Amino acid sequence: MRPLVATVDLTALRHNYLLAKQCAPQRKAFAVVKANAYGHGAPEAVTALREIADGFAVACLEEAEVIRGCAPEARILLLEGCFEPSEYLRAAELGLDIAVQDARQADWLLAADLARPLNVWLKLDSGMHRLGFSVDGLRECHARLKGAAQVGELNLISHFACADERGHALTETQLERYAELLELPFEHCSLANSAAVLTLPQAHMAWIRPGIMLYGATPFAELSARELGLKPVMTLTGALIAVRDVPVGESVGYGASWVAQRPSRIGTVSCGYADGYPRTAPSGTSVVIHGQRVPLAGRVSMDMLAVDLTDLPQAQLGDAVELWGAQMPIDELAQACGTIGYELLTKVTGRVPRRYIG
């Protein structure tokens, strides 16, 4: 079997969820498990959390069906609502909470003959300009849906654009726009994503929505996961499958972009961009062998990457290589590649086996 595995620590996942709850005492928390729990495996993540989680949030009906199979009694929120009229019938059968973000979705809901009322979360476009009603539009929709037979709870939800940039002016603007609607009779309100859970207590409302923090990555550029008390959930581990000596002046990898400046010892690692390791990782990016960092040498290939072992003479064939995890934070790798931890986690491909511990 190819020596590459993503080890998922479910104890760390539970720790991070409980940390989110500690940040917002007396609030409830939707664990955001969309995109296959950010690449970690939604069924396994939900099973690990279902005894402590107040609810789960996903992007679409197909994801909700998976979650319902793992957590028959859990509250499950469709963050983007339904994409066609027939989905409302299935949402009612599954007992979902749904976002309603425009007049078309409201029309579909009011026209539906449902087995049971749906808990509705009216989505405010408070400044991100992606989904949601304007302040006035939401007031109008609230009036339309209040008391409708298809509606159980009527709740309020919005999403921050810049909460991960502390002190950004737009965050205060979004809070103010959200506050304009709190005079309306809502059962529950939700606003805080991971960044706001960690640093904006005024945004916590009745329900928080921790996402990336559940998986042990930071939403901030300037605050590490360790500083925030988060534990990494996924460790991506390959192995040295070849070791060779490369003389001065010889190159390594596609494009001959890395050239040996000294007699070098080069290791080949069983991981590449087809596994989800970023091709954009530059030479010098660290991996960890025997607890010591060694740098990438040359371009990442589809199935392999090369590392410079010259300063780690004890490294040998078969040694484990941590691509990211507790010793090599995923956020550090993401920053080196000009991206974010979210993207790397969700891009770990299906050919990488997941191993669950805890």
Curated annotation (Swiss-Prot):
Its cofactor is pyridoxal 5'-phosphate. GO terms for molecular function: alanine racemase activity; pyridoxal phosphate binding. Substrate binds at R130, M302. Keywords: Isomerase, Pyridoxal phosphate. The modification N6-(pyridoxal phosphate)lysine is found at K34. GO terms for cellular component: cytosol. Its EC number is 5.1.1.1. HAMAP family: Ala_racemase (MF_01201). This is Alanine racemase.
